[in-house]
Amino acid sequence: AEFSAELSNLGVRVANLEDRIDNVKWGGEMRYTASKRMFHDGPDSSLNRLELRLKPVATINDHWLVRARIDGRAFMDTDTSTSVSLKQANAEGHYGNWTIEAGLLPVTTEQGIVYDDNLSGGQVTYANDKVTALVTGGRISTGRFVDRYKNDGVKELPGEKAFQSTGNFGKAALTFRPSSKFDITGEYIHISGLSSENYTPETKAYGSDTVGIWGIGANYKFDKNVKLSGYYGENTKGDLEKKFNRNFSAELRYKGASKADHGSFGLYAAYRHLGNMSVVAPTFGTIEPSWKGWEVGGEYTFAKNIVGYVAYFDGENIADRGTDVKKIWSRIRYFF
């Protein structure tokens, strides 16, 4: 009887251990990115980067889980690498139509035009079939703000950059989906305490330490293969000309690659304008803040969980006498 009890207890302990192991799921990807910027009568630059992203998800209970992302990077052209670092670590709770997030979490604005990165803070979302409402608040460091370019094609130096200090980030967004083919989103992004008063992309200084960007975006699906997306946003703070304080994007997309579907593909064409003070960290790999122009690209699934991307940009700096710029960008992602 005693031996039987010990076996029973051992079985319970093993079962508990298995349950805990099952509570943590690991996923991620390895991605390789290569790109080249080519300025007319200006400096060219290239990127040749390998990146590993690990994404564990731990279930806490019926309502809560914890997500994290751990990144490591290597630069293939110089044979150097960076230290592995924590990019995301946030708790996520689900209660009916409500989702609550807190920690170092990913935040994306409509279509990723203004922001697609992480920050330290919290987010509350309400979503049903027709409406999604979202409120975000937190702190955003200067490292989140993507580099801008001067009119000669040179990156702004540290003392010339628009955002000189960690700021307070707030966002509110409301999405309405009247049908399965159409959705429209209105949003407002407010960032304060940036020490950006002296930023001068041309001759006039910005004159404010705050960014206040309102934006409207919409998506329309003509059928299962063709989608048209549009966005317009404007920063109402500061004293710069409107070309620096506004952004807009129009994109036509055909199909799309799925990592689970070998042979699937997608194509797109777009025109975008990303004013220096109207965006923070856009989602795009080709066009960059302070540029405007045309972009075309495509994606293809070579095998299950292996997807390749390529894009080409042709445009110019937004500043007067802005230098013409072209950029080729490519990426391959191995999901696991």
Where are these regions (language model features)?
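N-terminal periplasmic/intermembrane-space "pro-region" immediately following the signal or transit peptide
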Residues: 1-29
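Functionally constrained cores in energy, signaling, and assembly domains
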Residues: 10, 48, 330
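Outer membrane beta-barrel
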Residues: 25, 29-36, 43-149, 166-187, ...
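Outer-membrane beta-barrel pore domains
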Residues: 33-45, 78-81, 94, 162-164, ...
